[in-house]
């Protein structure tokens, strides 16, 4: 009886403790009800998630729950090598037959078919239409053979060694060197430290087919696999495909995936990364701590707290930079990154102005110490919570339109980490309820927990010897930390949010003309001269896309301004509009479900706004204000201007950028290709930048608004006339630009400044079309280029094992009336002449041969699939209309593409190709070689 009473008292005490304010029973999280999971008799797990966007498309992913972490010391790189070999022969599809089979279905390697190897997993991905049942069956048969019947023929293995070596070589850039210098600090005491997926090239050079097969048989077993199906497919059909093709795999057991717990490195470390190609100088503080796996409500809250701390830091830092309180740095960020299966890192970084490392260190120390002393305010936290809840509510409303690839990737992550897959609705409701327990006090406790963590290191990044000499010593950093810990700092005052966007629009504007261009495609001309193209998509998206296309771009400006126009546009776009600051605009945009972006090119500027069909007005308000009431933040401009000057000063230290600039100047005889001098950049004020940006949209008569979405025309017309028709002509209109003047002489550029053991080769051939290239001709050239790209891949990447990737790209300049072909690849330095000669021989042979019926059929399938997706996607359809307008001066040209596709013949394609691509007017060749 006494024991029973003691147990009862203990249970009552435990329950009372768990129910205290701020404490939470670890309740399980609910799985998305749409997700179907199960396991076959042989141990293979599956996940099926029906998702109708885009229509008739499905993603099929095979996830092997093993990556480079499971490699033995003599296998470093084998997991990645095995992944490559899946595309080099299976029992039924030997050699390149796997890739050829995919291509015969109209699928493109890279876009529709891909694979990757990470530390924890190896994943094979195929995306294809669900309407082609025979192809679905064949793809599933390939997945079955990837799972159990790869061949690892010696000839294929030997050929792939060079491909992997070139992949390794191609990635040895400044980013790679920085990563290598950081790894011993960031990944200390983790298995990840010496298990990079790319592996060791000694292993790649010597591993035998038998060793590859042994690794494959050890890990590629059903109980170590998950098959993921996401898309517009009936769940019963998906399950039948899985069972029919994967249930017959032998029920062999894979080796058990081992776990290596990360040990804390509990002492402060100091790192300096000195690389001339670093774009900025800066200082950062990294913390390492256990990863939060979100499995229950308590971990859901904890993960949100860490995430909110990062967002609060970033928000405050940006506010202080934009307000002018932090003029000693040019930017900064905080982020959280996964560094091992069980560990993460939170870091806080600021970028120095010029090479002032002391100022940067002071700024970061002050920010951290201010939070130490005062934490974050209730107003800041409420703002972050409100903004996040708005994003989550928008995700609920827009869940039917989730990106298919991102959705599949999230499911794969859930499978890998064995965590619940939450629906958007559950995520929103949980956040609304559980975030109430996240308070200023709980965040302060979390912050102090982080700051007391001894597993940390300071990192300074410098790009020149002056900055390196100014880098702080460990003793100086420790002294500065102590100084700021004892310094009394003022609390940060949150500026609040203005969420009112006042638009003074003229409701009297009229439509002066209307024309039907095609079915569901209408052209309007407004009384202010602006043109509007209205289109409806074939899908059911509740999205409205508005794109303002100006026929003014950076080529409309003189040489002494041209290279600053894109920078000015970036500064204006980041400064808010009208009465809304940049931060207030982000909150306003979230609450009204709108997004905005802009892009300046040579002859055009695009301003794109996305809104919702059930509330389109904010989208029109935003684009009106961006054109008529744009503004610029002086401090944002100063930061961007400083960064541009520093980039110019250090251009000689970045060979790849210097090489690209030299090639650009070589191809044109035009001062507008030249870089500006430091004093020219410095003299361009914020007011100059704002004036230049406003000139891009200075005349409504030079703007075409492309509007795509399923909204009633009468409703749209009222918004169009009010918000677009009220845009007035500027007092300082800008003339349309002129194409760059082409260089008339052939040229060759060789730069021996590369820091990596790799050659970068670029060859531009220019062809004079004399007359504008129409859509049928462009389609013929594209079909040819697809076949040429395949030839280059087979001959250079695979047979010659000479390059990791080979790029073949055709572009048409409608204003200059010329066609350019770019051939680009990276390779072993001593082979660049050999491989360039081979590439040109391949092109000559392909020109003589033309394309075949089979190749044309593959191209037609590929394009038809793109057209099907495009016409159901609001965003893609809007982009297609814009491209049609820019390339052919006809917003309806794209409507002929499907019919033209059917009319294409081998004879017509080959005739067009020989007419336009047989005789280049100029050839410009460039090679970037190691020092």
Swiss-Prot record:
GO terms for MF: metalloendopeptidase activity; metallopeptidase activity; peptidase activity; zinc ion binding
InterPro entries: Metalloenz_LuxS/M16 (IPR011249), MPP/UQCRC_Complex (IPR050361), Pept_M16_N (IPR011765), Pept_M16_Zn_BS (IPR001431), Peptidase_M16_C (IPR007863)
Alphabetical list of SUPFAM superfamilies matching this protein: LuxS/MPP-like metallohydrolase (SSF63411)
Entry coiled-coil feature ranges: none
Name used for this protein in its record: Probable zinc protease PqqL
Cofactor(s) recorded in Swiss-Prot or TrEMBL: Zn(2+)
Membership in a protein family: Belongs to the peptidase M16 family.
Annotated source species: Escherichia coli (strain K12)
Active site annotation, chain numbering: 83
Keywords: Hydrolase, Metal-binding, Metalloprotease, Protease, Zinc
Domain of life, source organism: Bacteria
GO cellular component: cytosol; outer membrane-bounded periplasmic space
EC number: 3.4.24.-
PROSITE patterns in the record: INSULINASE
GO terms of biological process kind: proteolysis
Enzyme class: hydrolase
Binding positions for Zn(2+) per the UniProt entry: 80, 84, 160
Cofactor: how and how many bound: Binds 1 zinc ion per subunit.
């Amino acid at each position: 009886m006494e024991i029973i009473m003691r147990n009862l008292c203990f249970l009552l005490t435990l329950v009372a403790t768990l129910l205290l304010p701020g404490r939470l029973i670890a309740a399980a999280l609910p799985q998305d009800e749409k997700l179907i999971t199960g396991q076959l008799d042989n141990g293979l797990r599956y996940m099926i998630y029906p998702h109708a966007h885009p229509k008739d498309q499905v993603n099929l992913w095979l996830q092997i729950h093993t990556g480079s972490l499971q490699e033995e010391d003599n296998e470093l790189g084998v997991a990645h090598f095995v992944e490559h070999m899946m595309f080099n022969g299976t029992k039924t599809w030997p050699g390149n037959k796997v890739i050829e089979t995919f291509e015969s279905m109209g699928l493109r390697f890279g876009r529709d078919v891909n694979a990757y190897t990470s530390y924890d997993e190896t994943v094979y991905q195929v995306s294809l239409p669900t309407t082609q049942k025979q192809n679905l069956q064949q793809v599933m048969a390939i997945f079955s053979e990837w799972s159990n019947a790869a061949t690892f023929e010696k000839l294929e293995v030997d050929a792939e060694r060079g491909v992997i070596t070139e992949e390794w070589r191609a990635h040895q850039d400044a980013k790679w060197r920085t990563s290598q210098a950081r790894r011993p600090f960031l990944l200390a005491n983790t298995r990840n430290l010496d298990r990079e997926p790319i592996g060791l090239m000694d292993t790649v050079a010597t591993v035998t087919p038998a060793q590859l097969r042994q690794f494959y048989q050890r890990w590629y077993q059903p109980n170590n696999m998950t098959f993921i199906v996401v898309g517009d497919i009936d769940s019963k059909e998906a399950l039948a495909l899985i069972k029919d093709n994967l249930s017959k795999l032998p029920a062999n057991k894979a080796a058990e995936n081992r776990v290596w717990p990360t040990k804390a490195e509990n002492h402060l470390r100091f790192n300096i990364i000195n690389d001339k190609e670093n774009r900025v100088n800066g200082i950062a503080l990294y913390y390492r701590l256990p990863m939060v796996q979100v499995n229950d409500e308590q971990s859901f809250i904890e993960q949100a707290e860490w995430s909110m701390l990062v967002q609060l830091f970033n928000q405050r830092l940006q506010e202080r930079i934009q307000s002018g309180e932090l003029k000693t740095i040019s930017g900064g960020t905080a982020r959280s990154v996964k560094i091992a299966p069980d560990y993460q890192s939170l870091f806080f970084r600021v970028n120095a102005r010029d090479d002032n490392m002391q100022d940067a260190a002071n700024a970061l120390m002050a920010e951290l110490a201010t939070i130490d002393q005062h934490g974050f305010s209730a107003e800041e936290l409420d703002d972050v919570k409100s903004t996040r809840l708005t994003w989550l509510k928008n995700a609920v409303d827009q869940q039917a339109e989730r990106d298919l690839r991102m959705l599949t990737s999230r499911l794969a992550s859930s499978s890998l980490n064995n965590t619940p897959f939450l629906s958007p609705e559950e995520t929103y409701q949980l956040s609304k309820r559980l975030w109430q327990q996240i308070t200023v006090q709980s965040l302060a406790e979390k912050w102090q927990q982080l700051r007391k963590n001894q597993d940390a290191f300071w990192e300074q990044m410098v790009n020149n010897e002056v900055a390196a000499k100014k880098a702080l010593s460990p003793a100086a950093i420790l002294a500065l930390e102590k100084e700021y810990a004892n310094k009394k700092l003022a609390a940060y005052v949150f500026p609040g949010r203005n969420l009112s966007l006042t638009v003074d629009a003229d409701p009297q504007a009229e439509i002066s003309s209307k024309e039907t261009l095609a079915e569901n495609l209408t052209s309007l001309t407004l009384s202010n001269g602006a043109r509007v193209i209205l289109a409806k998509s074939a899908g059911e998206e509740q999205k409205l896309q508005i794109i303002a296309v100006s026929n003014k771009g950076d080529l409309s400006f003189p040489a002494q301004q041209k290279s600053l126009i894109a920078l000015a546009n970036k500064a204006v776009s980041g400064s808010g509009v009208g009465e809304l600051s940049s931060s207030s605009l982000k909150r306003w945009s979230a609450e009204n479900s709108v997004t905005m972006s802009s892009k300046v090119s040579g002859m055009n500027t695009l301003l794109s706004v996305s809104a919702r069909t059930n509330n389109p007005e904010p989208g029109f308000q935003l684009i009106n204000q961006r054109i008529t009431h744009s503004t610029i933040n002086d401090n944002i401009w100063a930061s961007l201007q400083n960064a541009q000057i520093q980039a110019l000063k250090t251009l000689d230290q970045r060979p790849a950028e210097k090489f690209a600039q030299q090639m650009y100047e070589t191809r044109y005889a035009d001062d507008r290709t030249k870089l500006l001098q430091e004093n020219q950049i410095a003299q361009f004020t914020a007011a100059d930048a704002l004036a230049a940006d406003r000139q891009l949209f200075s005349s409504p008569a030079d703007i075409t608004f492309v509007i795509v979405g399923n909204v009633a025309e009468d409703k749209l017309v009222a918004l169009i006339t009010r918000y677009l028709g009220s845009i007035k002509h500027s007092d300082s209109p800008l003339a349309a630009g002129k194409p760059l003047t082409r260089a008339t002489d052939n040229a060759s550029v060789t730069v021996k400044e590369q820091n990596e053991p790799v050659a970068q080769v670029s060859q531009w051939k220019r062809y004079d079309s004399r007359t504008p290239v129409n859509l049928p001709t462009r389609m013929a050239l594209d079909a040819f280029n697809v076949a040429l790209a395949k030839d280059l891949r087979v001959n250079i990447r695979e047979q010659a094992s000479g390059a990791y990737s080979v790029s073949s790209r055709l572009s048409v300049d409608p204003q200059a009336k010329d066609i350019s072909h770019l051939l680009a690849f990276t390779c072993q330095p001593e082979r660049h002449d050999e491989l360039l000669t081979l590439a040109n021989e391949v092109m000559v042979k392909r020109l003589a041969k033309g394309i075949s019926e089979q190749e044309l059929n593959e191209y037609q399938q590929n394009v038809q699939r793109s057209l099907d997706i495009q016409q159901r996607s609001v965003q893609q359809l809007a982009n297609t209309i814009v491209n049609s307008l820019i390339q052919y001066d006809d917003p309806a040209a794209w409507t002929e593409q499907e019919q033209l596709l059917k009319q294409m013949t081998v004879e017509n394609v080959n005739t067009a190709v020989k007419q336009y691509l047989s005789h280049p007017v100029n050839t410009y060749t460039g090679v970037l070689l190691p020092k």
